[in-house]
Amino acid sequence: MPSFDIVSEIDTQEVRNAVENATRDLSTRWDFRHVTARFEFDEKQKSIKVTSESDFQVKQMLEIISEKLAKRGIEGGALDISAEILHSGKTYSLDAKLKQGIESLKAKKLVKLIKDSKLKVQAQIQGEQVRVTGKSRNDLQAVMALIRTGDLGQPFQFNNFRD
């Protein structure tokens, strides 16, 4: 029986490259001359910290990192950006966590979306991934198209496709 897994994974090497490109971009921008601004990528916490001297610059830096991540193939929905900008001393900072894996609540919504489509497939939650099995490849491809168009606020990848 054909099957595939729905996962949400992020390549940390690509994130690191995007952060380095964004840092390089900051050094060439005129509006960031003589300003203390930096990006910090924490691989263990899976987060990007944006720090600058004003909240407006933090917002600009967030746009820069989003653009660089998109160029590297990481969708904007992969970032979980904190709502408020933290201010301490003369610096403003913002944390953006990377969404890795599928949470149980999101997995339940995913399974419900698949079941509501009335396609002849079964979806099972297996840890941080969802396995979809069906009798025909066409049904599985229809599920893939459904998930790509469904707005669940997180990018999904399909792997382990078996025929």
UniProtKB/Swiss-Prot annotation:
HAMAP family: YajQ
Gene Ontology terms, MF aspect: nucleotide binding
Family in the record: Belongs to the YajQ family.
UniProt cross-references to CDD domains, sorted A to Z: YajQ_like (cd11740)
Name of the protein in question: Nucleotide-binding protein HDEF_1968
Domain of life: Bacteria
Entry keyword annotation includes Disulfide bond: no
Pfam families linked: DUF520 (PF04461)
Keywords: Nucleotide-binding
